[in-house]
Amino acid sequence: MAWGLFQILMISFFHLIKLSSQQETSFVYETFRSQENLYLDGSATVLPNGLLQLTNASDHQMAHVFYKDSIELSSSKPLSFSTHFVCALVPQPGVEGGHGMAFVVSPSMDFSHAESTRYLGIFNVSKNGSPSSNVLAVELDTIWNPDFEDIDHNHVGIDVNSPLSVGTASASYYSDIKGKNESINLLSGHPIQVWVDYEDNMLNVSMAPREVQKPSRPLLSQHINLSDIYPNRRLFVGFSAATGTAISYQYVLSWSFSTSRGSLQRFDISRLPEVPHPRAEHKNLSPLFIDLLGFLAIMGLCTLTGMYFFKRGKYAEITEEWENEFGAHRFSYKSLYKATKGFHKDGFLGKGGFGEVYRGKLLLSREKAVKRMSHDGDQGLKQFVAEVVSMRCLKHRNLVPLLGYCRRKHEFLLVSDYMTNGSLDEHLFDDQKPVLSWPQRLVIIKGIASALCYLHTGADQVVLHRDIKASNIMLDAEFNGRLGDFGMASFHDHGGISDSTCAVGTIGYMAPEILYMGASTRTDVYAFGVFMVEVTCGRRPVEPQLQLEKQILIEWVPESRPTMEQVILYLNQNLPLPDFSPYTVGISNHSSVLIDAASLVASRSWSAASSATNSP
């Protein structure tokens, strides 16, 4: 019996030794002269000085480098790992820089299905965000892509099965000497150290310049359970990079990795291989050509100087302190000028009370709408700031999403998503547009009601729009209503009182009490009621060409005006309509029943919606 027990103990002991050896992986590459246990594909290659080059001067390419031995996940022991590598991203001369690179953890070394450019050779369109991707990546991204909600063009992100990062931060490091974060330019061409540590389901990412030790504080910390990402428990680690039309050279100088806690091998930073910096090629020229070039240079100096000052004035921008407070994304005027082809008439979408709107296409993004606002002294600046504030604070599916802004001399520019179907008033009053069906009108009204309810009760502050009308409502590809144009908006704290005493708005939509009581949520509700009648009747609030008694669609409104929460309940038929008489005692003793009339018109219209498939 004793001998049998001894055999069992010995077998268990050797099994544990074997299991431990399977789970622990550790290696270091001070240079990559020896490619032992490395898998390279795509444009990846090792230069004579031992530098691992991922991408070169070719466009639309991918590169992958993986350590060939896999890491086995144990069901009994949580995975932990640490890696330290030094990389350098070098743009071509005269080019802002291409796409970045990433440290990758994957169950496979086969990325033939991946795409280049913004997908970094890791992801693709068809499986973007799919759990079956089974990929964890720490990206060093040098292209701003709003489709992936990138914060800027110089950031670090943690990606799980998608290029839409679960955690992101601008490239920087914590300086223990200065006690604050110092920024890092990923495209500086200088070596950058990166540390990735995973333990107890927490992923920490740190970075620092070549000469700085590992910071005491990580740049990014994200809770991630790798067991949820990798069901087959067999992993490979390595790097991926890609180029598009824009190109950068991406290099890895040294790399150390370990799954054993505290056993990450160090390499000598002072002995790193030199990073090459591409220069423009020059051919041998004869003295005659040299003299000719000198003459042309002198002749062109004045022209170039003039062009410089002309372009400097053309694209000059203004920056003020309030912009840093709101932290919204700022576009360069040059990028917007090029996106709209110089605000060409072919991209002109329309003109409103505060400026013209143009269609434009920014680099690597969908079409955008660029509003070029009119300048009118302090009032114009207030309208511009109001929209910038709304861009930072307000997020709702029925609001036009503002993406950024620009200010240049006396011009204010706002960038938003391009709404495919234009503004609502075009579909109501333009004979060239298809007539909206009753179901479409109902969806639009309910969407704007939801947006207005959010502005009044759901945002951090009470937001008074103060200019609700059909021309300020845009329609997306599915004909959902999106409320926009916050140039007249005002903000105040919940429970507070608005200081908006000026009577602003559009005639026909303005509540009568606004002249002596100022704006409030009730005046927004009045404008919404007029808008609702306008949509259901297909008639403008004011028609000057009609007989005097028929010019104004709605003249007065009852004092018992509902809140936006009640309006939504009415629209969803979750609350019975109030029983108003045709006229009630109210302002000037002539208060007609707007919400009753609007609801009556809407109810009769909507009751036919189930059978109405054609235009109303």
From Swiss-Prot:
Record keywords: ATP-binding, Cell membrane, Glycoprotein, Kinase, Lectin, Membrane, Nucleotide-binding, Receptor, Serine/threonine-protein kinase, Signal, Transferase, Transmembrane, Transmembrane helix
Gene Ontology cellular component annotations, sorted alphabetically: plasma membrane
Binding residue positions for ATP: 349-357, 371
Keyword Transferase attributed: yes
Record localization: Cell membrane
CDD domains on file: lectin_legume_LecRK_Arcelin_ConA
Domain of life: Eukaryota
GO molecular function annotation: ATP binding; carbohydrate binding; protein serine kinase activity; protein serine/threonine kinase activity
Positions of region (Legume-lectin like): 24-258
Ranges per topology, Cytoplasmic: 310-616
PROSITE patterns membership: LECTIN_LEGUME_BETA, PROTEIN_KINASE_DOM, PROTEIN_KINASE_ST
PANTHER family cross-referenced by the UniProt entry: PTHR27007
Name assigned to this protein: Putative L-type lectin-domain containing receptor kinase I.10
